[in-house]
Regions:
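Beta-lactam-recognizing serine transpeptidase/beta-lactamase-like catalytic domain environment
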Residues: 68, 215-220, 225-228, 268-320, ...
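Periplasmic/cell-envelope proteins involved in peptidoglycan metabolism and beta-lactam response
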Residues: 1-290, 314, 336, 397-407, ...
């Protein structure tokens, strides 16, 4: 007979043995882990690994003028575990800080909600961007404060007060960016706006490390193994911009006390010669320890100086858009250069009327461009959308029209190397069907023919239209950076794109734009010897109309294409044309005539009252 008590004892004994063995294995594992921890702690006590920050790349204008460079800056950091016995009163005296400020700062550093990476064994920021006086005072007394260190970095400096929104600025990296990119640590600087953000990886360089030896008291004794284990920092790459800083300064001066933008492009290369967003600001405001305060004030400004209107703002292009319509009508065979349309004070269809200013009627294409006849382009669109050549009727014609617009760079981002570029708006047939059902016709959408209605473009897209016409049908994606030190720019900044319109059609538009300058709405841009071609734009607005201009010069072998857009500036000839003319004269002639200097002074002093509402 089985002895069940004996069997039970065997199982219990086996269980006890297994439990003891498991306990010993766990303890051995823990001891091994602790030994590794103790080894790491011992090594950390013996050595201090210091991050060496690289110099950020400089920025130059197209003529080699230094725009952005670096100035040395020093931070005070500390390792809490090493700084436990520091005389806080003496430290506060050395830094010109009260004890209350000291303890408040320490509380913020130790607060893991504010500083999730906090550890008493790791380096923490204490004071950043010391003034020269603070640096000298602390360096002299640094030996009194074990566990506190000086860290050399650099902040940006600027040689000019212009182009702030283009150049951008640097600020402390966000927590979310640190989580996404292991390169960054708390307190690191990163490009936050403009080219500093777009070209962050090229500009930032590569951080290095310096391994320093400590004594038994934690004091730094010097380099470990004569720097054998150090990793040198690699400085950032310099950028040569396409920007002409003198042209940029003139543009910003002309736009003082106004809201709007200017974009100038070299047609052959797509290089942006100037890009003004008004109101502008001095880029040096966003450097140093006052950066946060100044950034907050600029952010609160209802005129939005931190917004780059040239790429982020979308506006009705007004009559500058008529050139794209003429190109489409010519290429589709809707009109010829000799086609004339009547203008009875505007476009009149049944009981609908879209007004126009006084000029001769009927008129063919080139005089229609020169006089900016609304009726001509409305009749052209009406003929296209009513044409029997499109089997799908108005909807097919509408989508064909949109194909032309997209090929000219509208309705999508062009791909400029600046953050925040907007798409603008080019509607298609589905858009109108959604809003009007199947009952819309050409007359329903007729205002798009003159750059109104649902059509919106960025000032950059308007300037690119000018560059495309100047090139007779091709453009290169507009860009701000001409060259990167030791690297190449993107391929699409070197490769021409073609529109759906042939060169011959463009020649007719060029002649019409030249006629606008010699005998039309752009006569204020008729500068002797420059052969300017232009097109005004007066974009309707709920308040006062916007003043726009798009042009290029010279007529043959053009060197500059430009768009000017002044919010609530009235007629295109009031602000757009004279500002555009002055900038083309400056760029092509190298300087302004005495008469033009007087005109520039007068325009810069003009004030447009925008009230107190947000823009």
């Amino acid at each position: 007979m089985k002895d069940y008590n004996l069997e039970s004892r065997k199982f219990i004994l086996a269980g006890v043995v297994i439990l003891v063995l498991v306990t010993y294995v766990i303890r051995l594992f823990n001891i091994q882990l602790r030994n590794e921890e103790y080894k790491t702690l011992a090594e950390n006590n013996a050595y201090y690994t210091k991050t060496v920050y690289p110099a950020r790349g400089h920025m130059y204008d197209r003529n080699g003028k230094l725009l952005v460079y670096n100035q040395p800056s020093y931070d005070i950091t500390f390792i809490p575990r090493e700084a436990m016995n520091v005389d806080t009163t003496e430290l506060c005296n050395a830094l010109g800080m009260t004890l209350e400020e000291f303890y408040e700062r320490m509380e913020r550093i130790k607060n893991r909600k504010l500083n999730p990476g906090y550890s008493s064994y790791t380096e923490q920021d204490f004071v950043t961007q010391l003034s020269g006086e603070e640096f000298a005072r602390f360096q002299e007394n640094m030996f009194r404060f074990p566990g506190f260190y000086l860290r050399k970095r650099s902040i940006r400096q600027y040689n000019y007060k212009a182009a702030g929104v283009l150049l951008g600025d640097i600020g402390e990296v966000s927590r979310s960016k640190i989580e996404k990119d292991p390169y960054y640590g708390r307190g690191d600087y990163i490009g936050t706006q403009g080219l500093e953000a777009s070209y962050e990886e090229a500009l930032r360089g590569q951080k290095g490390t310096e391994v320093l030896l400590r004594d038994a008291h934690g004091r730094i004794q010097g380099s470990h193994s004569n720097g054998e284990f150090d990793q040198p920092a690699i400085r950032g790459k310099d950028l040569t911009l396409s920007l002409d800083i003198e042209l940029q300064e003139l543009g910003e001066r002309l736009m003082e006390n106004k809201i709007g933008s200017i974009v100038a492009i070299e047609p052959a290369t797509g290089e942006i010669l100037c890009m003004v967003s008004a109101p502008s600001y001095d880029p040096s405001l966003l450097t140093g320890r006052q950066r946060g305060k100044n950034h907050k004030e600029l952010s609160k400004d209802k005129r939005k100086p931190l917004m780059n209107r040239a790429v982020m703002g979308t506006y009705p292009p007004g009559s500058t858009f008529k050139t794209s319509q003429a190109l489409t009508f010519l290429e589709e065979g809707i009109i010829t250069p000799e086609t004339s349309f009547p203008c009875a004070g505007g476009f009149v269809f049944n009981r609908f009327k879209l007004g126009c200013h006084a000029h001769s009627s009927p008129t063919p294409l080139k005089p229609a461009i020169a006089t900016s006849c609304n009726a001509y382009f409305c009749w052209g669109l009406h003929r296209m959308f009513s044409s029997s050549k499109y089997e799908g009727g108005t909807k097919e014609a509408m989508n064909r029209w949109r194909d032309y617009m997209v090929s000219m760079g509208f309705g999508y981002r062009l791909g400029v190397d600046l953050p925040g570029e907007a798409r603008g708006m080019i509607p298609n047939a589905d858009y109108y069907t959604k809003h009007y059902g199947n009952y819309w016709r050409a007359v329903t959408v007729i205002s798009i023919a003159i750059g109104q209605g649902e059509v919106t473009l960025t000032p950059l897209q308007i300037a690119n239209l000018g560059a495309t016409i100047a090139n007779r049908g091709t453009y290169i994606t507009p860009h701000m950076v001409k060259a990167i030190e030791g690297d190449t720019i993107r391929q699409d900044y070197l490769t021409p794109k073609s529109t759906l319109v042939g060169r011959n059609s463009y020649e007719h538009i060029v002649e019409g734009m030249r006629l606008a300058v010699t005998d039309g709405t752009c006569r204020a841009a008729n500068i002797p010897g420059l052969d300017v071609c232009g097109k005004t734009g007066t974009a309707q607005n709920r308040g006062k109309d916007h003043s726009a201009f798009m042009g290029f010069a010279p007529m043959d072998n053009p060197k500059i294409a430009i768009a000017v857009y002044v919010e609530n500036g009235g007629f295109g000839a009031t602000y757009g044309v004279p500002i555009g003319a002055l900038l083309m004269e400056k760029y092509l002639n190298g300087e302004l005539s005495e008469e033009s200097k007087t005109k520039a002074d007068e325009i810069s002093k003009r004030v447009i009252n925008y009230g107190t509402s947000e823009r």
